[in-house]
Amino acid sequence: VSAYGGMLALRLASSLIMTRLLAPEAFGLIALVTTISVIAALLSDVGIREAVVHSDHGDDPRLLNTAWTMQIVRGLLIWLACCLVAIALFTARKIGWLVGDSLYASALLPPLLVLGTLSSVVTGFESTKRYTADRRIEQKRVVLIEISSMFIGIVSMIVIARLTSSVWSIVAGGFVTSVCSVVAGHVWLHGAPNRLQWDAMYARQIFRYGKWILASSLMYVLAVQGDKLLLGGWVTPAILGVYAIGQNLAQILEQAIGRVFTQVTAPAFSDVLRNSPQRMREVYLRLRLPFDLIFITSAGFLFAIGPWLVGLMYDPRYAQAGTVLQILSCALLFSRYGVSTSAYLALQAPHAQAFLNMARLLSFYSLVPLSYHLFGVQGAYWAIAVHAAGIMPVAWYYDRRFGLFSWRHEALSLGAWPVGWLVGSALVAAATTLAQGIR
């Protein structure tokens, strides 16, 4: 957890420095490039990592090498898909289909897509030793590699931004991070080296496990990444850049804690199901409790301090990011159901994850456009924040079906929100009083 805290601190520091070196428009462009790249990645997600982690043959070199080969092909396909999108955008702009101030009409977007997503080819060569470490819950070296790679990439990005004041500095930093991470994984992690190999039996096993992962990823990515897709057509690059800063602050904690529960809960659930399946409910509720409390308390805390925090950290160009942070903090109330997803995958029920994401997708595309047309951009922000409430009835249904549900747990954990809000409000009041006293 402390290591992921270090990664969180690095992201915050880089955000603070880069917003002083680049204009808001740069962050809007990169936000959309990242969104398209993530969509392409998740649309080709056949659950390679999950299949290896949960397989009874997860240490078999034939399975690992087959997974590595599939991963390389997938990385190339992601990049080619993004190149096709770039060509389509360039052509649409040339013939006059994309005009005005919308982000899609930017002349920089196509080349940024081509070069900005090249790192997906690099990460395709990532060692499957990472999967073995996940399976054995041996995370120390993996986390150190991630922190070191991120640090080197951030330093590279800042140096290039300082010299050029260009959005390309962000692209270069991401590429350096990917190269460092892949090389270090092959060199420093324990395990046999990978080689190109294709075992038809294991390939079928991965595809069979991953068909529901793929369906789930399709729905998940269209919902979770849909905010920038929609906003990109509604607002200017500068407004989307400010939104991206606020969203980044709201998601830093979610992603850091999300990484912890992905790395910890999946192997833990698989282990208990292999050795003591009767303890699954006990382990599930015990693992959910700390994550629920962290997410819900953080939601209340960020809601209280959002505008004050952004005003403290960023220059006036990004002031509206404080309102974005305050609104999007509400999304943390629903992030806790990621633990449920890990449990369903361990129970060999990836279809449950697919139905969860179907509910998320339907909720998103019914609420967000309607809220935008009724209440403007602010209404869209609120809909983006709370649309995930649509997954709750589905999660409760599957929890009951698998014998994991507890009304008491669901109700009592919500009491953490006012605690977080009170702490945040007290912090803002104390800081304001102190600042006035100093003046």
Identify what each model region corresponds to.
Residues V1-R11, V33, L42-G96, A107-T117, ...:
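Membrane-water interface segments that mark the loop-to-transmembrane alpha-helix transition
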Residues A9, S14-A41, P61, P110-P111, ...:
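Interfacial/gating helices of multi-pass transporter permease domains
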Residues L12, T69-G100, P110-L115, V155-V159, ...:
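Alpha-helical transmembrane segments of multi-pass membrane transport and lipid-handling proteins
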Residues S44-N65, D134-R135, G246, A250-R288, ...:
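Helix-loop junctions and terminal segments of transmembrane helices
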Residues A88, P111, A359-S363, L374-F375, ...:
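Transmembrane alpha-helical segments of multi-pass transport proteins
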